[in-house]
C-alpha cells in the first residue's frame, strides 16, 4: 500500500538512505551514480536538487558530490543551428530536447574525468556545464562558465527525461511507432544508453517518476515555463511550450511503458514512483538487482 502522507521526496530519501550506506560499506572506490528519470515537469529536477542538498548535508564534509541535468549537456545554440540544417527534414531535431541534441563529446569527457579521477593527481576538479534555457527567446544556450566539482567524485547525480529509455533494434524488434523522424532519434539514443544506463562500468541507483496520464506533461511544462518567465523575464509562449512538448510525445509512446515496466534504470536498485497530475504519489515499487 502507498502511504498518501508521504511525498516523492520522502520516498526518495528513504530509498537512498538505505542503499547509499550499503554502497559505501563495500569499500568500492568508483563513483556511485544516481539517475533520476521522469517526464518533463514531473518534479524530477526539483527532487534531484533537494536530494543533492540532502546528501551534501549528510556526506558533504567527507564526500564529493556532483549534480547535473542531461539538459546541461545540450549543444551550444550555434551548434544546434548547424544540427537543424543537417537534419532540416526532421522536425524532432529542430531545437533542443531530444536525443541527438546534446554534446556527446563533452558528456563523455566529463564522465571520463569522473571515472579516471584517481589516475590524474594533478587534476583536482571537474567542470560541469550549465545551460540557460531562457537565452535566444527560449531556444537556449550554454552558459559561459560551469560548476567546478572536487575530485575524486564519490556520488554523481544525473537527471533527465529520457534516462533509461532503451533504443529499438531495427530489423529485430518490430514496432509500428518506429517510423519517420523517430528513426534518427532512435539511432542517436544508442550513444546515450551505451554511455550511461547500459554502461557495465557504471554502478548506479535509479529513481523513476511515471504518471497515470502522459498528457499531464503539457500542464506541468506550462507551469515550469511560467515560473521561469517570472524569475528571468523571458521564455517561451504557451503556444511554443505546447509545440515543444508535442516533439517529445513520439518518444514517450515508443519507450516509456517498456522502460517503466523494466525497473532497470539503476544497476544496483531502482525506485519507481507513480504520480498523479498534482504530483501526489499513488504507487511505489522497488527492485533490487545487486
UniProtKB/Swiss-Prot annotation:
SUPFAM superfamilies: P-loop containing nucleoside triphosphate hydrolases
Record GO terms (molecular function): ATP binding; kinase activity
KO phenotype (gene knockout): Leads to cell death when overexpressing the camptothecin mimetic TOP1-T(722)A mutant.
Localisation: Cytoplasm; Nucleus
CC annotations in GO: cytoplasm; nucleus
Alphabetic keyword roster: ATP-binding, Cytoplasm, Kinase, Nucleotide-binding, Nucleus, Transferase
Described function: ATP-dependent kinase whose specificity is not yet known.
Miscellaneous information on this protein: Present with 4280 molecules/cell in log phase SD medium.
Protein name stated in the entry: Probable ATP-dependent kinase TDA10
Organism: Saccharomyces cerevisiae (strain ATCC 204508 / S288c)
